[in-house]
């Protein structure tokens, strides 16, 4: 059954236009119609909180190695790359960072830590790394006023002073971009949700090495833990905050 038909059938207090807008995202081509019925009670208005900060998660050089090619063509040589999905997100992410910087929002860069003796929790394949592999990619160079934290595990909060900084600054809302959608982004979203922050994930500014994993995780987080929003929508909300 078409998605629109399902939406009409499950109409309640929330008008149809709001439902269609809430579900108008990249996952529409993979989510079965019955799942929209199951998750209908989660439909709501999305927004950016009044005291937001931007989290830029794991946009380091290692992710872009091998160039703008499908990951399956290059992961044998570059296991950590997200290939074309990483490169496609560069311009939208630059626009997001620029808008947040113009508006004076606190910007936190969270990146992995280089260590040749880093302890791995799994036996998955990893490529040989150098110290600059975990540096922020030049397309997103931090400004002097931005804050950069290093982490050794998936979440931006685990083993970092991030929560203390956010609390001290009175931040109540987080805008999130970076990678990977199913890994470090998701781990950070769940921790942020657990700490009580309102979370907005910018759809065009997060990515994964698997498009299926990317879409499924966005769908799941959107209905449970965060507002997945289009870049244009986020920029419009930010302009409203800056007026």
What are the residue ranges of the model-derived segments?
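A short acidic, glycine-rich active-site loop
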Residues: 76-91, 126-131
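Short catalytic/ligand-binding loop motif for oxyanion handling, primarily in non-cytosolic enzymes
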Residues: 116-119
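Short, flexible active-site-adjacent loop segments at beta-strand->alpha-helix junctions, enriched
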Residues: 58-60, 113-114, 153, 180
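A short, N-terminal amphipathic alpha-helix
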Residues: 87-106
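Short beta-strand segments at enzyme active-site cores
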Residues: 105-112, 202
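A solvent-exposed, charged loop/short amphipathic helix patch at secondary-structure junctions
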Residues: 64-82
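Acidic-leg catalytic submotif of subtilisin-like serine proteases
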Residues: 52-65
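Active-site-adjacent betaalpha module
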Residues: 1-53, 70, 98-103, 124-243
């Amino acid at each position: 059954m078409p998605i629109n038909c399902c939406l009409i059938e499950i109409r309640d207090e929330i008008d149809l236009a709001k439902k269609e807008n809430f579900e108008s995202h990249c996952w529409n081509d993979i989510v079965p119609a019955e799942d929209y019925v199951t998750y209908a009670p989660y439909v709501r208005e999305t927004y950016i909180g009044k005291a937001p900060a931007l989290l830029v998660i794991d946009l380091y050089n290692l992710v872009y190695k091998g160039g703008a090619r499908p990951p399956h063509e290059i992961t044998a040589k570059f296991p950590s790359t997200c290939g074309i999905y990483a490169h496609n997100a560069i311009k939208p992410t630059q626009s997001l960072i620029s808008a947040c910087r113009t508006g004076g929002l606190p910007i936190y860069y969270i990146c992995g830590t280089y260590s040749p003796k880093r302890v791995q929790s799994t036996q998955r394949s990893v490529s040989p790394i150098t110290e600059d592999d975990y540096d922020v990619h030049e397309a997103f160079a931090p400004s002097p006023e931005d804050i950069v934290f290093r982490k050794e595990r998936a979440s931006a909060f685990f083993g970092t002073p991030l929560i203390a900084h956010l609390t001290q600054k009175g931040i109540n809302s987080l805008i999130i971009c970076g990678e990977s959608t199913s890994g470090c982004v998701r781990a950070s979203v769940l921790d942020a949700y657990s700490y009580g922050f309102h979370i907005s994930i910018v759809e065009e500014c997060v990515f994964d090495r698997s498009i299926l994993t990317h879409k499924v995780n966005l769908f799941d987080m959107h209905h449970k833990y965060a507002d997945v929003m289009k870049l244009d929508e986020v920029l419009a909300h930010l302009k409203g905050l800056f007026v």
